[in-house]
């Protein structure tokens, strides 16, 4: 096998990956609107959701920090809108990215409250609580590091329930603390719940990823337990009423999309019930309900949980809850993508530019792989040197395939040549390439990250297609510089058009990935010349002009 056959193998592997990727794409069918709420779950979160009367909406209050702009409904204390000021909606846009939304076209909310026998969010106890607040807008002031938003509700029996949102400067983790004051003569049985609900089908103005075949990242629910560190749960599975219903001590539930996530992390010593639910009308939910606790008469009970609402910043997420950083969708090659991203981030801490960081990491990766590359070219050179003997053998033995196979193996053994030696290094390179693809698609740090000149977003395609064309040119030079023994006309035609085929494929790929491939090809050209010089000295290569 020679260099040009390697290009053919790369193309076949690449196309196979794209076909598999398209097949794996999480395209959820839009469910028919259901007017009746599903009864396959007994989770308190979904019951609380159903308990909100249409005519009993509370008022909306604004809560702002340097990184979060939340809108909270005093009816139940749900977060109905979340804007992220540090992340523009689009490149060069003044509008912040909106993660949570409540509109006629799309629902995505973070709900929470107190259920159980005596909880105010239990539908059996009437509408969800209408909390009282001191003001309609809360803003984290300059020099202030923490913002508290207390909300109080007193039921007919005189019991007081306080729900306090605690936000910190520069933090996307929101603590939700509950205090229950029992003014009665009997114990109160209380459970906490946290629920994330979202429209299964994205409206056209949000469904930007489906127009680009290269942008395939997971959108759906996920959860973590001590036994299962990270498990995805597809929206279409929830739509089919195949619902989650497990008990866990610790863990979290979440909803994910490219670059951003929301998650509820319960904080208690007991067991939590993790569930999913089809709420009808094309809305899916994932949530938790805690084990009930008793608040004795005259006593105060405290419960709390944490809501993550923001970008998937791995180190910050890992500090909030174990394995929460796994929500970054690096696909099945996460074990390669994660170390690569850590290395890329370390390089960026010195360079300050993600594009130059990609260039440097490309040199590092190709440098580490140089021994494999050298072994690959050496093996191919030896195979080329054996071609005259192999051809003579075929002419001598005619159609006796068994004899040909036996004598070829004997020849390989005598000459100490591994016929698969040219393939193995190639198979090692492909997972690294795919891992880089997943890393660029899943790392929010690279979202809208500029490089230089016309490249203002490394996570988006080149607007002028200059990088893909340059990539095709480098492939063409590699092809022309590589010796070949391919005689089959069809293979020759395929390899002739290979740079064009790859260029077309890469038109829609993120600029960062194309940049990596260009630099990798340039390194290949340099390494190729160094290796060929060494092979010439050993008599394994000749710089005679390639036959056209």
UniProtKB/Swiss-Prot annotation:
One Gene Ontology term of the biological-process aspect is: protein insertion into membrane
Biased composition range(s): Low complexity: 30-50
Q: Which InterPro entries match?
A: Membr_insert_YidC (IPR019998), Membr_insert_YidC_N (IPR028053), YidC/ALB3/OXA1/COX18 (IPR001708), YidC/Oxa/ALB_C (IPR028055), YidC_ALB_C (IPR047196), YidC_periplasmic_sf (IPR038221)
Key word Transport present in the record? yes
**What membrane topology is annotated for this entry?**
Multi-pass membrane protein
Q: Does the keyword Transmembrane helix apply?
A: yes
Segments spanning the bilayer are: 6-26, 350-370, 420-440, 458-478, 499-519
Report residue spans for region: Disordered: 28-55
Q: Which domain of life is it from?
A: Bacteria
Where in or outside the cell?
Cell inner membrane
Tell me the GO molecular function terms.
membrane insertase activity
Q: Name one Pfam family in it.
A: 60KD_IMP
Any one annotated GO CC term: plasma membrane
Keyword field: Cell inner membrane, Cell membrane, Chaperone, Membrane, Protein transport, Transmembrane, Transmembrane helix, Transport
Q: Describe the family membership recorded for this protein in Swiss-Prot or TrEMBL.
A: Belongs to the OXA1/ALB3/YidC family. Type 1 subfamily.
Which proteins does it associate with, and in what oligomeric form? Interacts with the Sec translocase complex via SecD. Specifically interacts with transmembrane segments of nascent integral membrane proteins during membrane integration.
Protein purpose: Required for the insertion and/or proper folding and/or complex formation of integral membrane proteins into the membrane. Involved in integration of membrane proteins that insert both dependently and independently of the Sec translocase complex, as well as at least some lipoproteins. Aids folding of multispanning membrane proteins.
PANTHER family membership: CYTOCHROME C OXIDASE ASSEMBLY PROTEIN COX18, MITOCHONDRIAL (PTHR12428:SF65), OXA1 (PTHR12428)
The protein's name in its UniProt record: Membrane protein insertase YidC
The organism is Escherichia coli (strain UTI89 / UPEC)
- Gene encoding it? yidC
């Amino acid at each position: 096998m020679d260099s040009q056959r390697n290009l053919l193998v790369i193309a076949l592997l690449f196309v196979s990956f794209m076909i598999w990727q398209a097949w794996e794409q999480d395209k959820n069918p839009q469910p028919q609107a259901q007017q009746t709420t599903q009864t396959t779950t007994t989770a308190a979160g979904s019951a609380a959701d159903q308990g909100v009367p249409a005519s009993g909406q509370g008022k909306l209050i604004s809560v702002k920090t340097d990184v979060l702009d939340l809108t909270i409904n005093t009816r139940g204390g749900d977060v109905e809108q979340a804007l992220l000021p540090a992340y523009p909606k689009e490149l060069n846009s003044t509008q912040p990215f909106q993660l949570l939304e409540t509109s006629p076209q799309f629902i995505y909310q973070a709900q929470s409250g107190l259920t159980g026998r005596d909880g105010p969010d239990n539908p059996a106890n009437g509408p969800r609580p209408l909390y009282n607040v001191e003001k309609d807008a809360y803003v984290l002031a300059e020099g202030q590091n923490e913002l508290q938003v207390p909300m109080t509700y007193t039921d007919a029996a005189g019991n007081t329930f306080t729900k306090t949102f605690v936000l910190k400067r520069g933090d996307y983790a929101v603590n939700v603390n509950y205090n229950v004051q029992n003014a009665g003569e009997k114990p109160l049985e209380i459970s906490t719940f946290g629920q994330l609900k979202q429209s299964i089908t994205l409206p056209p103005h949000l469904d930007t990823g489906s127009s680009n075949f290269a942008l395939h990242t997971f959108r759906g629910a996920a959860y973590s337990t001590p036994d299962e560190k990270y498990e995805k749960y597809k929206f279409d599975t929830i739509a089919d009423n195949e619902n989650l219903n497990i008990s866990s001590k610790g863990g979290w539930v979440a909803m994910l999309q490219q670059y951003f996530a929301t998650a509820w992390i319960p904080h208690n010593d007991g067991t939590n019930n993790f569930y999913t639910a089809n709420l009808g009308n094309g809305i899916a939910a994932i949530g938790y309900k805690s084990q009930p606790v008793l608040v004795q008469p005259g006593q105060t009970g405290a419960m709390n949980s944490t809501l993550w609402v923001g970008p998937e910043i791995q180190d910050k997420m890992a500090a909030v809850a174990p394995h929460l950083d796994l929500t970054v969708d690096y696909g099945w090659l996460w074990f390669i993508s994660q170390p690569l991203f850590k290395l890329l981030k370390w390089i960026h801490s010195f360079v300050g530019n993600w594009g130059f960081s990609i260039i440097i990491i490309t040199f590092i990766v190709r440098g580490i792989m140089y021994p494999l590359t050298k072994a690959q070219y050496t093996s191919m050179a030896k195979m080329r040197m054996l071609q005259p003997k192999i051809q003579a053998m075929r002419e001598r033995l005619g159609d006796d395939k068994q004899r040909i196979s036996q004598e070829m193996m004997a020849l390989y053994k005598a000459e100490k040549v591994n016929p698969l030696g040219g393939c193995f290094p190639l198979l090692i390179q492909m997972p690294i390439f795919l891992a880089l693809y997943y890393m660029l698609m899943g790392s929010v740090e690279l979202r809208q990250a500029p490089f230089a000149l016309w490249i203002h977003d490394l996570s988006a395609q080149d607007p002028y297609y200059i990088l893909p064309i340059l990539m095709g040119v480098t492939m063409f030079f590699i092809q022309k510089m590589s010796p070949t023994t391919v005689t089959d006309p069809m293979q020759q035609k395929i390899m002739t058009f290979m740079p064009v085929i790859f260029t077309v494929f890469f038109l829609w790929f993120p600029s960062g990935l194309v940049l990596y491939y260009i630099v990798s090809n340039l390194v290949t050209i340099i390494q190729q010349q160094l290796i060929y010089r060494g092979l010439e000295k050993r008599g394994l290569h000749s710089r005679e002009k390639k036959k056209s």
